[in-house]
Amino acid sequence: EANEVGVIDFQDAVLGPITYDPVSLLKDCYIRWPRAQQLEWLDGYLMRLSNLGAPEVSIKDTAPVAEQASRLQSLAIQLENVTAAQFQRWFDLTGLQRHLRVLGVFARLHLRDHKSSYLADLPLVTKYVREALALTADSHSSVAEFRDWFESELMAVIRKQSWYEAIDSQGWAL
């Protein structure tokens, strides 16, 4: 809802791919944003990263602040030649990795820790994996082979699970 407060959980924060944060926010395991909206926000994110430039650092600033400013400037320089299409590809590949990991985590929480409430979120996460595989299968033959296996073998098993429900594909890049 428009007036609800959201919480960003950063307890597992680690250094990772530049597109991990946008994947986590825009392809959340509990809510789905339309692909067009995701890409609009992703383009804005890339634009802001690319425009970081050189922040002004005063003599009063501590060494960590100056170091962070230097990192931001370096990041902006590294992103100068990254196209929106390339950044989107990184986003989709990072999303594939993240959501495959989440499928495993949610299964573990159910099987080992007896926390079955996460099973309700598996259909959305499965759909994210399928979408990412459809979008990135041309990136490498191993991704295409994995997609074929996932669709033919794993989806046959997934469809038989009590938690599985088909999600409407309208608005998905499938």
Regions found by a protein language model. Give the residues of each.
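Active-site acidic catalytic loop and adjacent metal/ATP-binding pocket
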Residues: 1-22, 32
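Active-site activation/catalytic loop segments of kinase-like enzymes and analogous catalytic loops
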Residues: 18-59, 67, 71, 93-113, ...
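Amphipathic alpha-helical interaction segments
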Residues: 40, 76, 86-90, 124, ...
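C-terminal structural cap/anchor segments
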Residues: 52, 79-95
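ATP/Mg2+ or Mg2+-diphosphate-binding catalytic cores
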Residues: 104-174
